[in-house]
Swiss-Prot record:
All ranges on the Virion surface side of the membrane: 22-146
Protein name stated in the entry: Envelope protein OPG155
Quaternary structure (record): Part of a stable entry-fusion complex (EFC) which is at least composed of proteins OPG143, OPG147, OPG155, OPG086, OPG094, OPG107, OPG104, and OPG099. Formation of the viral membrane is necessary for the assembly of the complex. Interacts directly with protein OPG107.
GO cellular component, one term: membrane
Length: 146
């Protein structure tokens, strides 16, 4: 055996030992790791201390660039029937004749989620809380879900 092969054997043995030590460390602290993950799971996609948003970049959606919770779009059950997509900006809207806007309602939560978080840019928004309708039922509902 020459010195080069001995060197590679020592390096390989050290690497294997480090892997075993790391594996044993994880094995010994597995309960603590699970407890830490359970405690901090709600903060997984929250804004980090450094000011950079910690975002899930695997899937692009409308909430990725928003850090204010009230501005984020969400699907909520609408009184009576169906679901609506809401944020502080208002509701996703259906545009009718003469450019009249009404709240877009969905039959299921899955339909609401698919529409709200699809790749299509949904720019039709109906905000019932602008003058002169500040105290109507739709505005009160919007304020209650934010």
């Amino acid at each position: 055996m020459n010195s080069l092969s001995i060197f590679f054997i020592v390096v390989a043995t050290a690497a294997v030992c480090l892997l075993f030590i790391q594996g044993y460390s994880i094995y010994e602290n597995y309960g603590n790791i699970k407890e830490f993950n359970a405690t901090h799971a709600a903060l997984e996609y929250s804004k980090s201390i450094g000011g950079t948003p910690a975002l899930d970049r695997r899937v692009q959606d409308v909430n990725d660039t928003i850090s204010d919770v009230k501005q984020k779009w969400r699907c909520v059950a609408y009184p009576g029937n169906g679901f609506v997509s809401a944020s502080i900006f208002g509701f996703q809207a259906e545009v009718g004749p003469n450019n009249t806007r009404s709240i877009r309602k969905f039959n299921t939560m899955a339909q609401c989620i698919d529409f709200t978080f699809s790749d299509v840019i949904n720019i039709d928004i109906y905000n019932p809380c602008v003058a002169p309708n500040i105290n109507n039922v739709e505005c009160q509902f919007l304020k209650s879900v934010l």
